[in-house]
Amino acid sequence: LAVMLMAAPLSGCFGIGGSGGLFGEEEEKEPLRLNHLQMEGTHNSYHIEPLVSPTREYLYTHEPLNVQAAELGVRQFEIDVWWDVREGLRVYHNQYDSGTTCPTFEDCLSTLLAWSEANDRHHPLMIWVEPKDWPEQAADITTTVELSGILQDIEDEIAEFWPRNRTITPDDVRGEWPSLNEGVLNDGWPLLEESRGKAVFILLAGGDMRDLYIDDH
């Protein structure tokens, strides 16, 4: 699966070694894993301030995604995705706040992937993807589709534009265990050294959309 539904927090430490032992001996430390990381993140990571804004909440502009990664140390990104009848998956906030550094989902993926491939020892990227489907928030050129349709389109584009060997998926974490939860409890999250240069795609959704995705997978 390309998109990971994250059910547990990724920050915080679980038993990472503490103080040294007697006579200055240090206890052996647990190797760092994915869930030990804390990272800088941006919301509406693609956002450009509109020329005219109905609210002060829209008055900010983010650097392009690759600049955020390269110069600001951002490793967590949040991307809103709409389905457009003419152009497929588009990225913007809403019809009143549509400025974006990467107009399509493909643009966003390509921008981050180019940076990732040029810096392949980076800490893993957490890419939160929020599908937008509400008719009252859709722009004129946006047509609402069935929830399962936009979810499948998102997975298809991730699979097409982001190499499988550069992603961490639920199957990777689950391993040989029957469920993702059992995999985490028994084997733990992936090691940091094994996760460098990769990305985790996380579905940011609740309610019917989240339930539908879980039922389908």
Residue ranges, per PLM feature:
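Catalytic cores of phosphodiester-bond hydrolases, prominently lipid phosphodiesterases
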Residues: 22-217
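Secretory targeting signatures
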Residues: 1-23
